[in-house]
Amino acid sequence: MPTAPRPFLIGVAGGTCSGKTTVSERLAELTGDEHLALIKLDSYYVTRDHQPIAERALANYDHPDAFDWELLNDHLAALAAGASVPVPVYDYVHHTRSGDVKMVQPARIVVVEGILVLYEPRLRDRFDLKVYIDTDADLRFIRRLQRD
């Protein structure tokens, strides 16, 4: 029995409110949702259960150390091998993982989107296509004010 081909991996990076999610969701629409798995880097913020909530709120979530790169790399390897992965669900109110997971199924195309997805070398080297969304800083600021 032939094995499924390795998925095409796309990394979509850019500043906060640059349009990463919009581009990624549009890709899903164009390819058909059943052919694309979307993973958000925000799901891989390190857990901060050991810290008081006031301390968690002060953490720099735009720093590379804020992410669990090892887990994300493991999940991409599993998806490439045809396995489903339990992606953590991040709780923005409590600044830590919720304890829930969202099962992501293997797909022909896997998109990983987030501010620093092109930062980590092992992750960056996995991508078949790397996209950087360059949006004017003033526009991103306005979008962030509207969103948050």
Regions found by a protein language model. Give the residues of each.
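Conserved nucleotide-sensing/catalytic segment adjacent to the nucleotide-binding pocket
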Residues: 34-40, 46-94
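Conserved lysine of the Walker
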Residues: 20
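Post-Walker A alpha-helix
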Residues: 23-24
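P-loop (Walker A) phosphate-binding loop of NTP-binding proteins
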Residues: 15
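Phosphate-binding P-loop
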Residues: 2-7
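Short, structured coil segments at secondary-structure junctions
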Residues: 32-34, 126-127
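ATP-dependent NMP and nucleoside kinases share a basic, alpha-helical "lid"
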Residues: 98-148
